[in-house]
Amino acid sequence: MVLAPKGGVGKTYIASLIAQALMERGERVVCFDTDRENASLRDIPALKAEPVPLFLPKSDEIDVRALDAMTERMLTEDAHFVVDNGSTSFAPLSRYLVQDGIAEAVVEAGKKMVVHLVVAGGQELVQTGRGFDSVAAQFPASADMVLWLNEHHGPVDGADGASFEQTALYQSHKHRILAVIRLVRLHPSTFGANLADMLTRGLTFEEADRSSAFFVIAKQRLRQVWRPIRDQLVPVL
């Protein structure tokens, strides 16, 4: 489950990476797209993301029945579930998960909930840092957490050379974090351009590697993007 209160920080991209890593090792994966404003995860056909309407039609009221149905599947089906979440539904979904004891129910069902949190660099650093602090403080110990540091918009480390992991914010929640995964900033005219092209086409890394739409060197760059991310993900999936 990918959570962040700010839009445009890479939540959907991260959800797609988690799904691809699981699919690559042959796991059964079910993707849920709960973002009512942007169906970005559904824009990647290979992931077969299913829409989950968090809100009642023409309303800001939560559709509890839809959430309960999603949770029922997560508790009873033998699969890995990847849930993408939009900024507008961040608060109500988080409230549902915490107040209704969903993490505890997942553990009782013999499974585990892993919450993937995003801290983005540049101008997004303060707000996403607060979001990380809020979720880490609210969610029960039964929910594991993975922290993603997204450097696409700028550095997440301090100007003094101190890493994000050395900050008081991270240290206060360190005991909750299974792993820290870094999305390094890509050169915009090479690696970044090839990745953007792949995402615009709605392809997975595997599909791009087989596609005739990409030059050989572009495929090589995409492999160089994917491999270190996949290697960081493997221990926590």
List where the protein language model places each region:
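Rossmann-fold NAD(P)-dependent oxidoreductase module
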Residues: A21
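Hydrophobic positions on the alpha1 helix immediately C-terminal to the Walker A/P-loop
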Residues: Y13-I14
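Conserved glycine(s) of the Walker
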Residues: V9-G10
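NTP-binding/hydrolysis catalytic cores, primarily Walker-type P-loop NTPases
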Residues: A193-L237
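Hydrophobic residues on the short alpha-helix immediately C-terminal to a glycine-rich phosphate/catalytic loop
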Residues: L17-I18
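P-loop (Walker A) phosphate-binding loop of NTP-binding proteins
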Residues: P5-K6
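Nucleotide-state-sensitive switch-loop elements of NTP-binding domains
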Residues: M1, E24, R28-F90
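Conserved catalytic-core segment of NTP-binding enzymes
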Residues: S89-G192
